[in-house]
Amino acid sequence: MSGVKRVFVEKKKPFAVNAKELLEEIGGYLGIKTITDVRVLIRYDIENLSEETYKKALTTVFSEPPVDDVYEGTFPAGNDDFVFSVEYLPGQFDQRADSAEQCVKFFNENETPVIKTAVTYVLTGTVTDEEKNRIKEHCINPVDSRQAAEDIPETLVTEFKTPADV
């Protein structure tokens, strides 16, 4: 049951309101006119879930089939696309992950899934390194978020060492 699975969920074009708004913000607020398209995907990293429960949750918990496209493991992106992900800092409450964990437990109450989420941005267009940094600064609130690593972790379980006596 262990082993981390990664799922990306993206709103279909007519329903991709967040992507459209971000494209307008990048062009209007940041003044970067060379971005021609923006995609926003929700990334779920999932561990401690049986294959049966995972398959059920894929189309009921993680996505809504009429409005979402689901990609397992990886998603299609152009070679020149600018891709980065944003996750909550350790210790910050992730409501999306918590809700997904609770919903998945309805399928099998004996499983204790560990789910972590991130938002992945895919920007199409020509941008300089300075413009990339400005876009990241716009999308990442340093108070509660950070840029996420793109590789799949070996485990999602966080081990905390017992502190020494004072």
Stretch-by-stretch model annotation:
Residues M1-V166:
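Core nucleic-acid recognition elements
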